[in-house]
């Protein structure tokens, strides 16, 4: 089979509707100013916009001629566009509509990973609420530095200021990483994986206000664990907490994989290192070995195409070619590095043809992992000698639905796990299905209290 495994997270037909509803519902669409929203006076000096970093960390080329510019690579990733993601925006909107009494809590919790700089700034101001939709729609050239930092998503000065304190511990989960405040009269500390000489430290401090520090933790899986371990609270009708759910457990899955024993970190796959020396700055930069590409390839090629198609509506700054390149790199990883599939020699008994399909996870986490809307399935076709289809399970329809999938026909049903597929309307789908407190299927993250199904492939 040429395409036995397919991953989809979204139906194209509904993207335009999401964008329309978000723009119509956003408070910012009314022309409300930053001062009117009460954010103008907040101190934003802890973070800096990525454009200030890109000025020096672009135009980086390997000896073989590969462009590994950090800024150009990063700005076309899901990390750089986490605040622009319309699927995420629609999900937050849905959760706040379902649980209005918890609207502020939901927006702060979701913004902690998707709009982390604006959320941290608001929290440092004494817990000032930082509603997600105060920053939407994203408008390039916005008058407020807080909004610019919100739109900058998971940016340079956010990740590189994360201190090693408590990383990998339960206290760090749900984005509870440590970014230390600026001591009076001191410079902000910016971490990188390399030793720093005094001369370049002085140059960096005088130009940017940041003081470089060696931080090996930035290459460890514990560094990723804070945002990629998410335990959600489930809310009842009045906003009361009625349960907790391990919604995303990428780090714990990695801990129980061969990758942890082999000391293969998250970064080794999602930020593959350059082989050979390369300058890490276009201004007086040293050549360094094993520079990690800031490509952050993952499981979401589709959304990268959405960013290209709706550039103006979503305030996208990455160039079309950059988004296409990142989407292509994501698809290459999905096609070649995620799973191994083998089909046995078919056995015929009368009019019945039987064969085994062996699917093995090749990653260091569940496949698929992360956000529980992701699914992977088998698309199986049996053809006759002339190429005609005798049997097909798992076909993709024009709407993006999977033919025969119960959940695509009725949201209160879902496809069970199969040991044997006998009919075209039986489809092997590896996925999590969330359930509410009454045992009914739900896609609401803060409505869910349990898993009704989780047959995702376990880590290698």
Model-inferred region functions:
Residues 1-8:
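N-terminal secretory signal peptides that target proteins for export/translocation
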Residues 12-25:
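Bacterial N-terminal signal peptides
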Residues 25, 29-31:
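Boundary at the C-terminal end of the N-terminal hydrophobic targeting segment
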Residues 32-64:
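N-terminal module-boundary/linker segments of secreted carbohydrate-active enzymes
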Residues 33-37, 60-97, 127-460:
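Primarily the internal scaffold of c-type cytochrome electron-transfer domains
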Residues 46, 50-51, 103, 107, ...:
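Residues immediately within or flanking Cys/His clusters that coordinate Zn2+
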Residues 53, 88-109, 119-122:
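N-terminal catalytic scaffold of extracellular/periplasmic and nuclease hydrolases
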Residues 112, 116-123, 134-135:
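Conserved, well-structured interaction surfaces
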């Amino acid at each position: 089979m040429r395409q036995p495994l397919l991953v989809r997270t979204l139906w194209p037909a509904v993207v335009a509707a999401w964008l329309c509803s978000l723009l119509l519902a956003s408070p910012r669409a009314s022309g409300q100013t930053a001062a009117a929203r009460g954010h103008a006076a907040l101190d934003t000096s802890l973070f800096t916009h990525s454009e200030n970093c890109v000025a020096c960390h672009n135009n980086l080329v390997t000896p073989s001629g590969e462009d590994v510019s950090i800024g150009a690579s990063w700005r076309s990733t899901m990390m750089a566009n986490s605040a622009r993601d319309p699927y995420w925006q629609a999900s937050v909107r849905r959760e706040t509509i379902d649980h209005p009494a918890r609207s502020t809590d939901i927006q702060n919790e979701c913004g902690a990973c998707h709009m982390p700089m604006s959320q941290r700034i608001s929290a440092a101001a004494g817990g000032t609420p930082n509603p997600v939709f105060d920053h939407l729609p994203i408008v390039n050239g916005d008058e407020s530095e807080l909004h610019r930092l919100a739109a900058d998503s998971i940016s340079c000065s956010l990740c590189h200021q994360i201190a090693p304190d408590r990383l990998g511990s339960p206290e760090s989960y749900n984005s509870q990483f440590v970014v230390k405040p600026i001591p009076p009269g001191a410079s902000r500390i910016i971490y990188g994986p390399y030793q720093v000489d005094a001369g370049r430290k002085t140059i960096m401090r005088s130009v940017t206000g940041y003081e470089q520090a060696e931080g090996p933790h930035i290459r460890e899986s514990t560094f990723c664990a804070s945002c990629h371990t998410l335990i959600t609270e489930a809310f009842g009708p009045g906003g009361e907490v009625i349960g907790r759910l391990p919604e995303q457990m990428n780090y714990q899955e990695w801990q129980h994989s061969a990758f942890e024993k082999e000391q293969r970190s998250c970064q080794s796959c999602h930020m593959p290192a350059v082989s050979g020396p390369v300058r890490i700055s276009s201004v007086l930069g040293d050549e360094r070995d094993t520079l990690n590409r800031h490509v952050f390839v993952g499981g979401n090629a589709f959304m990268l195409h959405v960013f290209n198609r709706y550039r103006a509506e979503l305030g996208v700054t990455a160039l079309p070619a950059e988004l296409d390149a990142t989407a292509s790199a994501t698809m290459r990883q999905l096609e070649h590095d995620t799973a191994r599939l083998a089909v046995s020699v078919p056995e015929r008994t009368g009019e019945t043809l039987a064969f085994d399909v062996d699917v093995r996870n090749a990653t260091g986490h569940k496949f698929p992992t992360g956000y529980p809307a992701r699914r992977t399935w088998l698309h199986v076709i049996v053809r006759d000698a002339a190429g005609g289809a005798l049997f097909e399970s798992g076909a993709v329809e024009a709407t993006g639905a999977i033919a025969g999938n119960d959940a695509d026909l009725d949201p209160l049903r879902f496809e069970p796990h199969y040991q044997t597929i006998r009919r075209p309307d039986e489809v092997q789908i590896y996925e999590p299905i969330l359930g509410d407190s009454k045992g009914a299927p739900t896609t609401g993250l803060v409505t869910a209290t349990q898993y009704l199904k989780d047959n995702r492939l376990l880590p290698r």
